[in-house]
Every structure is written in structure tokens, then in C-alpha cells.
Amino acid sequence: MPYAPIIGVLGYVLHPDGERALMVFRSRDGDLHQGKYNGLGGKLENDEDVIGCLHRELMEEAGITVTAERLRGAISWPGFGAGGEDWFGFIFIVDAFTGDVPERNDDGPLDWLPIDRLLGGGEPLPMWPGDRHFLQLVFDDDPRPFHGVMPYVDGVATGWSYRR
């Protein structure tokens, strides 16, 4: 059977100080990500490319206009969805934007979190445990994009591999 995942984008918006990234603390009832910090993003619509999707999602979720972004990688998440749906995501860093970030959006509060906290420094943040694997690659100094796969079964990551 052909692999036909839901395609999405995930963006990590850098604060102008370069030390923090914008995250949403998902607090909407019934949300698969409820109680966890996550980057911003969403599903690709059938009339857009992935950069257009990133720009649209960040305008909708954070009220910002992206002016510079970098593709950091792509990840296949077989079985990740609430009903076991497969996801395939393009992961970006947003280096520059215009606009003022609100305190919250429909999904929950928006917070500028220190990147070192996202990478595991200090008190652990409530996040998907699997995110800690790929966030190291998102924020490292290697300019090459990564290409990973992280299978999920019943909401738990069962593996992680990547190539550059």
C-alpha cells in the first residue's frame, strides 16, 4: 500500500536575541498535543507549497509575516496521528519576521523559550519525548538538512533514525 501521509510544516521562530524560540503551550481540550509545548505549524493545503504553508500558518497562529526561513529537515512520523494517521513534516527555522506576537492563540499561550531548555538544559519542559531527538538537529550548526523517520505506536515513539 502506498505511503500517503498528512503533510505539514513545523516552524521554530527565533527571537531577535537569537537565544529563544517561539513555542505554543497546547491547552485546547481534545488536542492531541494538549499539555505540551510545540513549535508552530499545521497541515499543507492542496493549493500551496510548504513555504507558503509555513507563512500562512505563522500568520494564523502568531500574527507574524515571515521574511526569512531555512529548511532544517523533514521527518516521517508513521502512526503519529490521534487515529494512527501517518504524518510527514517539513521543519523550518524562521530567522526573521515582522509583526507583534500575541500572548496566546486559539491553541494556547505563546512563549519565547530559551533554546537550551528545548535541547534539554535545566528543568525538563513538557514536550513530546521524541522532539528532543530532532530538535538537536534543528538548532545545530550543520547547514545540511536532515531527513528522519520516527515511527509511533499508540502515541509513543518506537524509534528514531536520520541521515544528512
List each language-model region with its residue ranges.
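Unchanged
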Residues: 44-67, 77-130, 137, 160-164
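Conserved N-terminal beta-strand and adjoining loop/helix that marks the start
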Residues: 1-22, 43
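Conserved Nudix-box catalytic region and its N-terminal flanking loop in Nudix hydrolases
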Residues: 20-60, 153, 158-164
